[in-house]
UniProtKB/Swiss-Prot annotation:
Homodimer. Component of the axonemal radial spoke complex 1 (RS1), at least composed of spoke head proteins RSPH1, RSPH3, RSPH9 and the cilia-specific component RSPH4A or sperm-specific component RSPH6A, spoke stalk proteins RSPH14, DNAJB13, DYDC1, ROPN1L and NME5, and the anchor protein IQUB. Interacts with SUN5. Interacts with IQUB. This is DnaJ homolog subfamily B member 13. GO terms for biological process: axonemal central apparatus assembly; epithelial cilium movement involved in extracellular fluid movement; flagellated sperm motility; mating; protein folding. GO terms for molecular function: unfolded protein binding. It comes from the Eukaryota. The gene is Dnajb13. Functions as part of axonemal radial spoke complexes that play an important part in the motility of sperm and cilia. The keyword Ion transport does not apply. InterPro entries: DnaJ_C, DnaJ_domain, DnaJ_domain_CS, DnaJ_subfamily_B, HSP40/DnaJ_pept-bd, J_dom_sf. Keywords: Cell projection, Chaperone, Cilium, Cilium biogenesis/degradation, Flagellum. One of its GO terms (cellular component) is motile cilium. The keyword Membrane does not apply. Pfam families: DnaJ, DnaJ_C.
Amino acid sequence: MGLDYYAVLQVTRNSEDAQIKKAYRKLALKNHPLKSSEPGAPEIFKQIAEAYDVLSDPVKRGIYDKFGEEGLKGGIPLEFGSQTPWTTGYVFHGNPDKVFHEFFGGDNPFSEFFDAEGNDIDLNFGGLWGRGVQKQDPPIERDLYLSLEDLFFGCTKKIKISRRVLNEDRYSSTIKDKILTIDVRPGWRQGTRITFEKEGDQGPNIIPADIIFIVKEKLHPRFRREHDNLFFVYPIPLGKALTCCTVEVKTLDDRLLNIPINDIVHPKYFKIVPGEGMPLPENPSKKGDLFIFFDIQFPTRLTPQKKQMLRQALLT
């Protein structure tokens, strides 16, 4: 279950921009790791930043309102026949400090944390200005939405992230962009984790967090994946279900399979086509199976003559 951005910011769906900004300011100041000693404050601070990053942008907010988190992060379909049939999915850069400093600009909302001589006070939260024992930030996990075609053939995804990089003085830092490249291998399953070690924010007293992308499968218009198998539902009229038929299935690699069905198709019947599923991650030259299920379509009405013919054929 993903984030409800409106719930995170404690606003309603019809809230105006000013209300969203006011909510972010209040919650960000309350939950900033320099202000809150609660164990969950860093994660809440990140969620607040991601929610504001989406809801403060009219385009992102519009997609989120209409298609939900899956549409926002997985991409939404464009017009039929487009060369790029899906929009690029949204990926939060994972840097709540960037959102915070862009929001407050040059103002220092934490002036109360500096002593009379202007020196920063050690709050021992391991944040950007903290001093003490060096520790690693918790991993930053982000969903990577991929189509079945991406996972069938394999592909390369390039994702831009923004992170803090230490300057030469090893104390101050600058936000810089970096491109992370993910080589998707054929057959990767949902839940596959890709780790980029220590690619998170740099700081004087922290080990940068690992960035972990977790594979999520986009919904497919024809197939549903179960492990390494593909499930396909074929609508079939009752007459063909009783008298045999040939099923045509267009595969992910654009081949057309003609599968003869010589059995009587009943509601629990299914056909297995070996080797027409997804590639096996450990051996992509081998594939799972294709399971064909049937949606038997009954007629909405029958003439008296047809009813009589069915009685003679089926009940005698």
